[in-house]
Amino acid sequence: MTDYCIFNISWMSDRFGCETGNEDVQECIDKSPNGSPTTSTTHRRQNSSSGLEPARKRPKLSPPVLTAMPLDLTDAVSPNESQACTSSLKGVVTAAGAAQMSVADRMTSSSVAPPLCIVPRSVEFINPKTEDMSMDIPMGNVQSEFTGLKCRVCGDSRAGRHYGTIACNGCKGFFRRSIWEQRDYVCRFGGKCLVVQEYRNRCRACRLRKCFTVGMDARAVQSERDKHKKNPKDSNNEGSTSPQYPTASTPISIPSTSTSQTPTSSVNSYNFQNIPGIVSRSFSENLIMRDNSVPVMETSQSAALSHVPLVRYLIDLEKATDNLIDENCDFMSMEFDQLCRVDVTIEAAFRQPGVVAKRTPPRWLALERLTTLEDVHIAWCRSFVLCIDYAKIMKDYQELSPTDQFTLLRNRVISVNWLCHTYKTFKAGCDGVALVNGSWYPRDKELQKQLDPGCNHYFRILSEHLMEDLVIPMREMDMDEGEFVILKALILFRAHRRLSEEGRAHIKRVRDKYIEALYQHVQHQHRHFSSVQTSMRISKILLLLPSIEHLSQQEDDNVQFLALFNLANLNGLPYELHSSIKQHIPNGDDSDDTQVNEVTSNNDGPRSSESSHTPQSVSTSQFLEFKPSLH
């Protein structure tokens, strides 16, 4: 007769938080010491209110009413103790037998069915802190591989056991970084935010609070960190690209993408090993990298496909810029007047772009709703900050003098901005204009009728030019990310007559380097191309540059019109950048050491606001030390 082990259902009920008040209890068969099976019958619990039938005896080998789920045990005991459970198991095991079944035995014995843990179908694992810790199986050592379990923090269906509870990789990583870096979060809504998978990044304070509520153990994180400290060999391996998560007090840096084997070229003379931090400490204060289960600093798929070091660097730089955000900021959770402001001077906005707009996560590809006049203002400000952050990161930009930095960026930021809108519209498959805050302007005439007339005046002509002259050509050639980032750098580094002689010479060298990188990238991505086809593709890419300039000039007129009638809140900084005054940069220094934290002047029309003296607790003057003024 087949041997069976007694499975204590009441123990499993206590162990996994199961309620067995009205469940059937099976008849178990035990192997007695003399070898003869003895039968132990338990009776059904009777609930008078439920109207259950009287208990009746089931056949000995009938399956229980409960669901069998495979239990994965990770070397809880030594192999010598694994003999406690015989090879004749047919799906029901004792608690002690389950604890003593080693992974090695299960892997080597193909005739043994995997151990089964009998639990009700509707059971969800409870907080391990409320479990009876005197039980035989140490749940902290169990690696859950169950299918269908949900993260107890956000509800993600792809979950496992991490830090003492059931959690997904995203919440696991968020909890680990929060503990390691001792982060403090504040909820703006009284700690009542709903933490679900779709919006789990919206409020980090409530997310961390829920991590503790469901039983995540901070001590497990600290012990894991101690293990890493004791075994630092992985971090010292040559060519290691382990991500570094910056805190508010540490500068952020782009990982090196240099390789030991690269083609001999002037492009390879680019010094990737000595790339400075993206921003100084004062600039990175209150900034974090976006919380994702996948580290944001890892090389993207497009970068991995490119064998040109400069292209890989530019792609990583693009990713780092997009993932540089302020804490507790989101387009959906912030009030309109808290997101952005335009009553600042150009100099102050370039020194401290975070004053113009909060660094909310870019949502180019969302396309969740049609744009409004408020979206025009918010998207303009957020896109402006993205462009400023991008330029300040670049080593080639940092090598310019402070005055040349200001002159170049002031005249190129609008064109860089529109290239970003164009490429993101292309990637989103949008028939119109995709905006950074998740809204979009439609090209369809019927949809345009639903919008504010100010939106149509701003975007109607722009959307036609953008689609016909830029997006459609990008679709036809299927532009990749490497070509986009090179084109973006070429738009930024365009010589201007008011640059110094050294600045113009530097920009010429930089442009030659980027064009050569573009040629190498196209050659590698399209190896079947002939030299004529390669040249044709590069020509088509470079021919997009005049269309970008034309689009920027068209926006200049639209912004001036809306600012004149005080529409879309585009007076002040947008008007000043788009107006003809941006071409005039007088000589002389301004002794005003203004740092913008709060601007007290009122900007009631299309003019620049006055500077104001504010406390110097916020300062980035050591990073960008230009002090030109406009009169």
UniProtKB/Swiss-Prot annotation:
<feature type="compositionally biased region" description="Polar residues">
    <location>
        <begin position="596"/>
        <end position="623"/>
    </location>
</feature>
<dbReference type="Pfam" id="PF00104">
    <property type="entry name" value="Hormone_recep"/>
</dbReference>
<keyword id="KW-0805">Transcription regulation</keyword>
<feature type="zinc finger region" description="NR C4-type">
    <location>
        <begin position="151"/>
        <end position="171"/>
    </location>
</feature>
<dbReference type="GO" id="GO:0003700">
    <property type="term" value="F:DNA-binding transcription factor activity"/>
</dbReference>
<feature type="domain" description="NR LBD">
    <location>
        <begin position="306"/>
        <end position="581"/>
    </location>
</feature>
<keyword id="KW-0863">Zinc-finger</keyword>
<comment type="similarity">
    <text>Belongs to the nuclear hormone receptor family.</text>
</comment>
<keyword id="KW-0804">Transcription</keyword>
<dbReference type="InterPro" id="IPR013088">
    <property type="entry name" value="Znf_NHR/GATA"/>
</dbReference>
<dbReference type="InterPro" id="IPR052499">
    <property type="entry name" value="C.elegans_NHRs"/>
</dbReference>
<dbReference type="GO" id="GO:0006355">
    <property type="term" value="P:regulation of DNA-templated transcription"/>
</dbReference>
<dbReference type="GO" id="GO:0008270">
    <property type="term" value="F:zinc ion binding"/>
</dbReference>
<dbReference type="InterPro" id="IPR049636">
    <property type="entry name" value="HNF4-like_DBD"/>
</dbReference>
<keyword id="KW-0539">Nucleus</keyword>
<feature type="DNA-binding region" description="Nuclear receptor">
    <location>
        <begin position="148"/>
        <end position="223"/>
    </location>
</feature>
<dbReference type="Pfam" id="PF00105">
    <property type="entry name" value="zf-C4"/>
</dbReference>
<dbReference type="InterPro" id="IPR001628">
    <property type="entry name" value="Znf_hrmn_rcpt"/>
</dbReference>
<keyword id="KW-0479">Metal-binding</keyword>
<dbReference type="GO" id="GO:0000978">
    <property type="term" value="F:RNA polymerase II cis-regulatory region sequence-specific DNA binding"/>
</dbReference>
<dbReference type="InterPro" id="IPR000536">
    <property type="entry name" value="Nucl_hrmn_rcpt_lig-bd"/>
</dbReference>
<feature type="compositionally biased region" description="Low complexity">
    <location>
        <begin position="246"/>
        <end position="266"/>
    </location>
</feature>
<feature type="region of interest" description="Disordered">
    <location>
        <begin position="29"/>
        <end position="65"/>
    </location>
</feature>
<comment type="function">
    <text>Orphan nuclear receptor.</text>
</comment>
<dbReference type="InterPro" id="IPR035500">
    <property type="entry name" value="NHR-like_dom_sf"/>
</dbReference>
<keyword id="KW-0238">DNA-binding</keyword>
<dbReference type="InterPro" id="IPR001723">
    <property type="entry name" value="Nuclear_hrmn_rcpt"/>
</dbReference>
<feature type="region of interest" description="Disordered">
    <location>
        <begin position="582"/>
        <end position="631"/>
    </location>
</feature>
<keyword id="KW-0675">Receptor</keyword>
<feature type="compositionally biased region" description="Polar residues">
    <location>
        <begin position="33"/>
        <end position="51"/>
    </location>
</feature>
<feature type="region of interest" description="Disordered">
    <location>
        <begin position="222"/>
        <end position="266"/>
    </location>
</feature>
<dbReference type="GO" id="GO:0005634">
    <property type="term" value="C:nucleus"/>
</dbReference>
<feature type="zinc finger region" description="NR C4-type">
    <location>
        <begin position="187"/>
        <end position="206"/>
    </location>
</feature>
<keyword id="KW-0862">Zinc</keyword>
<feature type="compositionally biased region" description="Basic and acidic residues">
    <location>
        <begin position="222"/>
        <end position="236"/>
    </location>
</feature>
<protein>
    <recommendedName>
        <fullName>Nuclear hormone receptor family member nhr-34</fullName>
    </recommendedName>
</protein>
